[in-house]
Amino acid sequence: KVESLLEKQISKLRSQGAKDMDNALMVVQNPKNGDILAIAGKQIDKQGKLKDYDIGNFTAQYTVGSSVKGGTLLAGYQNKAINVGETMVDEPLKFQGGLTKRSYFNKNGHVSIDDKQALMHSSNVYMFKTALKLAGDPYTSGMSLPNNIADAGRKLRKGLNQVGLGLKTGI
């Protein structure tokens, strides 16, 4: 059933223009204990045909991307850097030296969002601001990036570990 769902989703995405997609991987886990319930993978060959690629779940590597956002919020809550329901302004963040960071959903505006909305919209800015608060250096326009971030890094890693990121799977 998982493979069928994966195949349908691939077909849907490709019909919507996702032509560069060359594979799709899926792992279904029990959220209470982490047990793996199903694994599926499909690879799209040069002719556009789907081939089994379950092994890709173990052998392929990808940048974690937005999967870290839940763990970032968890670290923020546990370390009292942010509160549940806290609102922040999603806006382009401008740092010393010309570095600018923004969210994809809101590249130029100033939008107030809370933590739930930050997850729904995958707000990079909310996460950057949370990480800066973890480092004890809340965002101000034109600020330099903090240098002493070892403690904040440990706090963030602990939050990420609690949602299963950065841990050995036992597989």
Predicted segment positions?
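N-terminal leader/targeting segments and the immediately adjacent pre-domain N-terminus
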Residues: 1-12
